Design a protein with these regions (language model features):
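A charge-rich, low-complexity, intrinsically flexible signal that marks solvent-exposed coils, linkers
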Residues: 1-87
Length: 87
């Protein structure tokens, strides 16, 4: 299956997990999804009081320079591990 199809399928699989992944795992999923979909982070870093938005933005910027294909493949691999762990 081509990478784009694997990436789309992984997005559907992660929605069906029986338990929610940890916050760290969710941030990793988010950052890989954004990097795979859009490339390097864009826009301004959220303000100090937007803890959730800031954490998400920082996770995404941590992937700066990673190719979209590498991010998509890493996302697919992570979802596969999470499905094995959380069902």
């Amino acid at each position: 299956m081509p990478l784009l199809e694997d990436f789309a399928a992984a997005q559907e699989r992660v929605k069906k997990l029986s338990r929610s992944p940890s916050n760290e795992e969710l941030l990793e999923l988010y950052s890989l999804f954004k990097q795979g979909s859009l490339g390097d982070a864009q826009g301004k870093r959220p303000g100090m009081l937007d803890f959730k938005g800031r954490a998400k933005f920082d996770a995404w910027t941590s992937k700066k320079g990673m190719s979209r294909d590498a991010a998509m493949q890493t996302y697919v691999d992570l979802v596969t591990r999470l499905v094995a762990r959380y069902g």
